Amino acid sequence: MIKRMAIAAALVMGVVSVSGCKSAGEWKADPNADFFPLKTDMVWTYRVNSKSQRANYAVTDRVIGMQYVPALKLTGLVVEEFYNLDRAGLRPIIYLDQGGFLTRLSGLDYVEHRIQGPAWGRSEEQNFLPEHLTPDREWKNTLFPYGKLPGSFDVTQSHKSYMEPADVTVPAGHFRNCIRIETRAHYEGGAYAQQKQNLNLTYEDWYAPNVGLVRTVAYQGGPNGPEMERVELTRFEAVSDKAAPVTPPATVPPQTNS
């Protein structure tokens, strides 16, 4: 599902930033709920309002399933991500289970219907998410959006998960018992080093049980900075019902704007 690769790519061009908050209250989610489900044929569509790119666009993710990728010499779970932007098109993402966390491989492409890595090296985000996401977890990771190409920047991130007592409302519906992840991101190297200016961002991501990511908000600077990016779920298609978008226990019937 869409996370922050597109945001990172946009921000490095304009050198901009993102935010978070905390929650308290009783959390009633099923302890066995999956907050990042990746079942074959699941589909998510998001609308993206990007002030840094000065654009609004849609992103659709579809789970293809487990595949062996000869070019990378590994087996992973493949998700296809489609951006309705010029020169964007369809891109594969691969998820790997490693040490209790998911590793996310992106920056990949299709060449004659086969997954290939770019010449400059793929983007690899270890410790992307815990395999079993729960509130009150903390972890850190480092992201290389353009691989380890000389002159490229990197992002050091610290994450903490919280229970979300309030319903989360997006175009796809109202979702209860969500988990919110607050991420503090420090951008350095590459263009930031050349301008002698590092960048500190904060992200908030909301995950709904058995649905996955339903909203991301990015703010410039710290938690009180101006909003720069907003990503919201407009359509979710579960494996059991591919004919129409569905949402699990929601207080309002889902809408289907995309």
Regions flagged by a language model, labelled:
Residues S17-G20:
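C-terminal motif of bacterial Sec signal peptides marking the signal peptidase cleavage site
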Residues M1-A8:
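Bacterial N-terminal signal peptides that target proteins for export
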Residues L11-V12:
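Short, linear, compositionally biased motifs with a strong N-terminal bias
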Residues K22-S258:
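Conserved functional acidic sites
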